[in-house]
Amino acid sequence: SWEKFIELTGELGKPLVMRMNLNQQSDGAMWTLHRNLMSTLSPIVDCGVHYIDVMCQMTRSKPVQVYAIGARLTEDIPAGNYNYGQLQIRFEDGSVGWYEAGWGPMISETAYFVKDVFGPKGSVSIVAKNAGGAGKSASIESHSKTESILFHHADLDKDEMFAKEDLVINLED
């Protein structure tokens, strides 16, 4: 679950590096829905607030700097809007976060599912096995599933090899 994901990031130390996205390659009815949404907002605004909230929960800190860029990749949306964007956020505790979102038939499915956090003591990632398959990037459900969590410990032994094996937590939600 997202609660478990957030909880495990508390074991990583500070500062945190948080990488998340919500890219959706869309066609047909989903492209129509996305175009209609983009008449008033962008993908970065639609879902970005939720991901920033998750980052605030992970850091228990406030954003102090936000940088944003966007690109309009189609003539099918209003001239003042864009269908791809990314945010970079710096928090009071020194943590940093990156979030990107894009909608449309031109969006790549290769890296549409990134939910990844690392700190001095290791990393925690949501791993999408089934939800991350080809043709699933437009599915809202696939972006919110937490099929499994990969917990990597950065501890090294005397030979500077990893002291602990990665832990995979299988989830059903």
Q: Where are the predicted features?
A:
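Predominantly a Rossmann-like dinucleotide-binding segment in NAD(P)-dependent oxidoreductases
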Residues: 1-78, 85
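Residue-level signal for pocket-adjacent positions within structured domains
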Residues: 33, 38-40, 101-102, 162-164
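Contiguous beta-strand/loop segments that form the cofactor/metal-binding neighborhood of enzyme cores
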Residues: 50-136
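C-terminal glycine/acidic-rich active-site capping loop/insertion
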Residues: 91, 114-173
